[in-house]
Amino acid sequence: MTKENKKTGKVLRFFIFIFSLIAIATSTFAIYEIFLLSNIENLIRYIIIGILGLTDLLIVLKLMGKKKKKRKKSYLVFLIFYSIICFCIGGVIFYIYGQLSSINKQSVTYTSDLLVMSSNKANNIKDVKDMKIGILNDKKSPEGYIIPKEIIKENKLEDDNEIVEYEDYTSMLVDMYGEELDGMFVSDHYVSMFSGITGYENIATDTKVIISKDKKMKKAATSKIETASSGKDVTEPFTILLMGIDSTEETLAKNAIANGDTLILITFNPKTLNATMLSIPRDSYVPIACWSGKPENKITHAAAYGNDCMINTIEEYFDTKIDYYAKINFKGLVKLVNAVDGVDVDVPKELCTDDSSRGKQVCIQPGHQHLNGEEALVFARNRKQLANGTFGREQHQQELIMALVNKMKDIKDVTKFMEILNTVSDSLDTNLTTKQILSFYNVGKDIVKRSLSSDDADLVNVQQLFLQGEGQMIYDERAKMVLWDYVPNKSSRKDIIQAMKENLELVNHKNITEFSCSINKPYEKKIIGEGPYNSGFTYTLLPDFTGLTEAQARALASKYGVTVAFTGTGGTVVEQSEPAKRRTDKIRGTINLKLSGSKKDDDDKDKKKKDKDCEKDTDKDKDKEKDNTGGNDNTGGNDNTGGNDNTGGNDNPQPRIDE
């Protein structure tokens, strides 16, 4: 062997040694990443892992073996090729796993603002003196208590100010607008939280922020929901709550509480591929789980107090445990629809709504349309132009979800899947673990199998649910005003609960004993909860007594079963101690009604009447003297009709109580 050949052999052995180590390292990386794909094609995974492991063993034995006189260049090529393959396998899995992990945001940035009225003289934190400031009394609330307490401590606000604890933001806001409170700590999403309430439409200009503070926190530290279902297997029936957030933020890395603009509760049975889908009206009047005493209010207001409050409220009302949730904001929906290259839906009429940034208006035309992201947002958000308002919007949201599912099930390209993940991961948040998300692969696989063996277009049988109810104008105890609420029908709610529990295999199916159809009428799938029902349910609300006479008010009070007491006499009711439209079951004690004919008014009337009677007597006496022919004509007599009229009674009349 020549000197040159020896030198070439040493170089070749060196590269073989280096690439052997690289091959083993990349193979180990690939094996680790493949192990992460638990419960996905287990047999194939184990075969691949076995092949990679065996190859690594041979490479190690090759390195440890006796030196051969001749090293083949083909072996070096194999090592390079093997390293590239292993690196690509591991890299793709690493990327997908990382994107899926980012959907479950372990940490969120919360922001709390110290808010005051624009007319307040304070312009910065140093000006905050001799003020009454409100905070939430919920010690687990990052934006209502935890961060405010830090601001108070850092700026020594307790030294010169009074800190008052409240149960809810709305009561604080009412007191601040009513000048009973100088400032309040609230989430930086306060505009979207309150601008939809009558009287607070201009909250953005009515108020100003004195100081803001951000704090990044682990969600699990403030929420029990985050880890409640971490060990559940998605191969078993489960529930998931989809929440559409009224937020224009690009991502959900920053906490987006705002209003629960869209609430869709889904139960899914992976064994049967049956699902139920319920759109919960945002104005549903239900008990709010995180408020003291659990008073009824609009369900959308629960969103301002975090995921736990919203989820617990829905769980308790529908008597069903929610295993998972998924949140998406406006930007996320736009990105998702664009990522799947648009969706096909039927648009009933021309609809126009602001875009996701609220910068310009976007319109969609009637008919079967292929919509892009911004257009799909119009389809999902618009309600004011629809004949059935909110309920029409809920129907559109369900149709959009099904359109997205139909597009997603046709994706077979890994590159496209990675593109979608990359596009929407920042705008999604969930408590599903990465392992649980990966388990949906098997669900998708079952759907594909069914599609190959069936001509049925509906591969997943979706049973629509509808919460029937009636609208009522009810006095809001916290907002101190009358608001429109949607009062659910109890029978509808009962049927919905039964349907969800049946799909979750928690109760036995109810047998259908009656069925009818007609060849003259096409079959329509029944919507559970829609009714019709023989009876509805509404609350008895206190009437408006103003403008009624005492007798009319007494009769109306008797009709409504309330006790009233009157102050003053005569005239009509000008004031009542309890607001109209308040629920009568919330009223304790007597309702005081003030009549327009008060003591002073009655005395003035008596005085005028006496003066008029005296004038009449004087005129008659003059006529007698002038005539002197009328004798003792006493037909006029002493007109005592004025008399001592004591209808005014005491200066401080006691109320009369009538039932």
Where is each model-derived feature located?
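Short, Lys/Arg-rich, polar N-terminal cytosolic tail immediately upstream
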Residues: 1-5
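Ligand-recognition elements built from short beta-strands and adjacent flexible loops
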Residues: 505-659
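Hydrophobic alpha-helical transmembrane segments in integral membrane proteins
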Residues: 89-107
